[in-house]
Amino acid sequence: MDDISGRQTLPRINRLLEHVGNPQDSLSILHIAGTNGKETVSKFLTSILQHPGQQRQRVLIGRYTTSSLLNAKEEDISINNEAISLIEYSRIEKELIEADSSLKLQCNNLELLTSVALVYFAKKNCQWCIIETGLAGKQDPGSIIAGQSRVCCAITNVGISDEAFLCKFLSQITESSTNKAIFLLDGSNDEFVRNTITKRCHDVGCPLEITDPSLRDYNVHTDTWGTLEVRLPYSEEEYQIFNLRVAIAVLDFLSKEKKVCISKDQLSQGLISVDWPRSLHRLDYCYESTSGKKIALLLDNANNAKAARNLACHLRTTYGDTPLTFVIAITTGKKVSPLLDPLIRPQDYVIVTRFGSVVGMPWIQSLEPVNLLAFIKNRYTRNVNMQPDLQSVWTFLETSGLKTIVPVIVCGSLYICKELLRLHNCHLPV
């Protein structure tokens, strides 16, 4: 399991934000937690909440995420889908770094990024702030918001390999029982997750709603607008209906609490116009700067069991029994079998490697490739090779004569995908 709880100390970010006036206390926060689906939920909420009712002026909706595959760090912070300018980001960051230094806190990059977001949203007087948070409970910097600032917390799908985080995440439920915050849980979660969260909410008297887990239709049932019919944009990603039900449950709650005024027509229009995120990223990866050599890749984090099953479903639908080539690195502590069982078959070829150090997150380490190689060879396929780093992977593919008629699939960790994208941008001609 990725151990972040022992190495991130939330009091540091508390003290830093207190030094700059506790900007989070002036905000109305919608927390989005979970393993899969946070981006879909937060994007849809941003799209709808910008134009409530008949108001002439757009409402300002802040959005903060650290999970996007393609974003630079300043793009993780946006208002009405417009990213903070690099100049503004750098100015706020500089002020916080100076405060951090004077207080001798030694905040890490994630804590500083979270602080920049909260300061920026407060400065711009955002009416709503959508904060995507991890599952590390009190130890997650995105979970600093407490008390009346947090209006509700939506919990998307929790991957099996992340269930151990629940014991930490549940601390948020205990704190939320003291105000009117509600928890909205994706009903498609495994029974263990549903039962665990339901029991904790019951024990502390915290309201909980669980969304419809069925796939018999793509309808969403609400108290405010009745039944809504949904058309999903990508047939291979039918699981998006679960994320959408969570997002609409948030809006339904806000409407019943008289915190927003949204018509059914507006909601229906939002279903059509929302910029749906996709988990799969196709890339003609430039792996050599001098020659501009490229290779077709398919990138997907697939860093938890549910995401791995979704990727496998797409691969089987698209490529059938065709042998596939995988490049895989996995974060130390993750359970490997739930990530690879759905994906790797005897006819596939696997190259195991590692990602480099993650700036500002020294607790994030890549699983040793030699251990991953032995696991894959014993369990899935004899067609497995080990390379010490990403650049060596492409040299091996070029010299080995291994040819594929479909894209090479890169998966297993968000960090290998981000490192690959960084290298790609460095290799592109100026």
UniProtKB/Swiss-Prot annotation:
GO CC, alphabetical: cytoplasm; cytosol; mitochondrion
Record gene name: RMA1
GO biological process, one term: folic acid-containing compound biosynthetic process
Pathway: Cofactor biosynthesis; tetrahydrofolylpolyglutamate biosynthesis
Source taxonomy: Eukaryota, Fungi, Dikarya, Ascomycota, Saccharomycotina
Reported function: Conversion of folates to polyglutamate derivatives.
Coiled coil: none
Protein name, per record: Probable folylpolyglutamate synthase
Family as reported in the entry's similarity comment: Belongs to the folylpolyglutamate synthase family.
UniProt-recorded Gene Ontology molecular function terms: acid-amino acid ligase activity; ATP binding; dihydrofolate synthase activity; metal ion binding; tetrahydrofolylpolyglutamate synthase activity
UniProt-annotated location(s): Mitochondrion
Keyword terms, alphabetized: ATP-binding, Ligase, Magnesium, Metal-binding, Mitochondrion, Nucleotide-binding, One-carbon metabolism
Cystines in this chain: none
Keyword ATP-binding tagged: yes
Organism, as annotated: Saccharomyces cerevisiae (strain ATCC 204508 / S288c)
Metal-binding keyword on record: yes
Residues reported in the UniProt entry to bind Mg(2+): 132
Residues reported in the UniProt entry to bind ATP: 37-40, 300
Enzyme Commission (EC) number: 6.3.2.17
Catalytic activity reported: (6S)-5,6,7,8-tetrahydrofolyl-(gamma-L-Glu)(n) + L-glutamate + ATP = (6S)-5,6,7,8-tetrahydrofolyl-(gamma-L-Glu)(n+1) + ADP + phosphate + H(+)
Classification via PROSITE patterns: FOLYLPOLYGLU_SYNT_1 (PS01011), FOLYLPOLYGLU_SYNT_2 (PS01012)
